[in-house]
């Protein structure tokens, strides 16, 4: 009996260890799978050498050449398929069989061990939450003229704060940190609609919030974290695996948001109409029609977190790439300034609805900034909800499928000299014309619902700064073009001299 048990144990162990090394039939090409780790060792070695996960996919694209742009990995327990080209990304994002979001410890831990919110949910929960958000945010400016007013106000506040800093330094120029230059103002454009409040730069509360965001995004990526691929590590090495940091970051974020929700709970009944999305959500709870429990306090917290992450983080990072490249290429600053001066003048700041179409070079700058940011970035992961196919490859149920926008946006056919920052690539006879492969906001039902707000923020903050200031590199402290890796790529912190233009 004893030997029988030992034999069964050993056979089971071998099945676990070696059963996972066999790739599913017709799985997309990629590196070999090893027991327990899958292809994580190959990925890790290349990542250490190249610095970024997206560049690892560049290597695989050259090594495992196929005409479809799909590449297969296994990281720990997770099967992962990377969509690398424009056609591949379009196919995976419009395939209803791959319309799910991943499930597991990483995705549940962030939302109270449940699948809540709108960013990483699917099915009925995603449909109901997304519908509610879009319907009610429109009442508070989202996707309407009111949104332009909110963004215009924040751009005006940014301008005044920068002018005050220059004035305190003598009125001509000042040294400023470019890290998080616009973070508070961008966050305010969304937070005004969520909670009816805006924050001032430098307030301890918002400073702590932004630091928490920075740490969270620095220590994870879109595919997950070490503890999500190897769940046992959260018990064995909670710090090394990123588990403790992940939990603490979310605890801090939810503490901040819970305070705001409780303030709304105490006051929202004093008003005949909801003031913001939080009021609308609390009123929906009062109606008592939530038989499926989709409108809980935890769901509201998850939505606030998702809107924070999706709405402000990507815009801020794009602005970071924009300003870095403008500092490195002052001739682009001057050309944009001349366009603004001729079209808008210097008496008022540019406006989205009034001036955007007349400022094609300025808009081209923002488009190129988005490209430079997104070519270092992965999309939010999808999940195969059933066994399915992509370009003839077999994709098993629950496989994670994720877009690597780098392959799409660094394609030299659509983007000649793709590593260079060149707004002229979008201009033809003085008019904007987007390359066919320029699709950084995604496709299908999961296309970014905040793309309009993001584009308005980029345009307004960039043109407002360029109209009023020169951004000059400090000798010996030129910004580094190699970004920091994380859930989204970020420009490394640097300082500049901000020089006021003569009005």
Swiss-Prot record:
Asked if Ligase is a keyword of the record, the answer is: no
Query: What is the enzyme's main class?
Result: oxidoreductase
For this record, an example GO cellular component is: endoplasmic reticulum membrane
Provide the alphabetized UniProt keywords. Endoplasmic reticulum, Heme, Iron, Membrane, Metal-binding, Microsome, Monooxygenase, Oxidoreductase
What EC identifiers does the entry list? 1.14.-.-
Cofactors demanded by this protein: heme
Membrane association type? Peripheral membrane protein
User: Where in the cell is the protein located?
Assistant: Endoplasmic reticulum membrane; Microsome membrane
Which residues of the sequence carry a binding annotation for heme?
448
Has UniProt tagged this entry with the keyword Manganese?
Answer: no
Q: Which PROSITE patterns match?
A: CYTOCHROME_P450
Coiled-coil blocks: none
Q: Give the InterPro entries listed for this entry.
A: Cyt_P450 (IPR001128), Cyt_P450_CS (IPR017972), Cyt_P450_E_grp-I (IPR002401), Cyt_P450_sf (IPR036396), Cytochrome_P450_fam2 (IPR050182)
Q: Name one GO molecular function term.
A: monooxygenase activity
Biological process per Gene Ontology, one example term: sensory organ development
Note one Pfam family from the annotation: p450
Question: What does this protein's UniProt record list under function?
Answer: May be involved in the metabolism of insect hormones and in the breakdown of synthetic insecticides.
Which family does the record assign? Belongs to the cytochrome P450 family.
- In Swiss-Prot or TrEMBL terms, this protein is called Probable cytochrome P450 303a1
Q: What is the protein's species of origin?
A: Drosophila melanogaster
The uppermost taxa in this organism's lineage are: Eukaryota, Metazoa, Ecdysozoa, Arthropoda, Hexapoda
